[in-house]
Amino acid sequence: MARHRAPKSAANDNRGTAGRESDATECQHAEHGPLELSNLDFPAQFVVWALRAWVQAFKSGASFDAVTQHGFTRFGLQASALALDGAMTVLAASASRPIDIRCVHCRTLSPDEAILLDAVASAQDERHFMATVALRKTMPGTAARIALPHMADLARDLARAGMRLNSMAVRSMYMAAETDATPQARRWLH
């Protein structure tokens, strides 16, 4: 007797198991706002896609290369895929809270995706302390120090391939995400 299992949906830390058939449709029709993925340039969109693909592969147990359909290979970024895998493995093992990485179809950027983009952009600008500060918002300090070399390798490899993140645009998205994620009562010091 064969066991039948429902197909797994795309990875998304924000969703339960109910309504899996409509996940992609719901994500594609998310409300537009300042954290819209289309507001980012291609290198930043590529990094967000890679983060989301890594989470999808991690949750489904599939090969990261298979999930990305050899996307890194197409751009000659095999070393970047390894660096991303290293950083995300550290994050998955040590996250200090639930991390919001959306499904690959989602049109909006989560605050945590903005934090990771800020870390990559800071590393590309050789601002490693700021990259560590960003990483510490998702993981303990020791884990951030372990993840930093992987993030720096990813940033360097992307820059060598001509994929420099616009650090000002990423920073403004990060600030908007941080404002959206912070409850009104905690935004002001009294």
Residue spans for each PLM region:
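Polar/charged low-complexity regulatory segments
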Residues: 1-117, 121-190
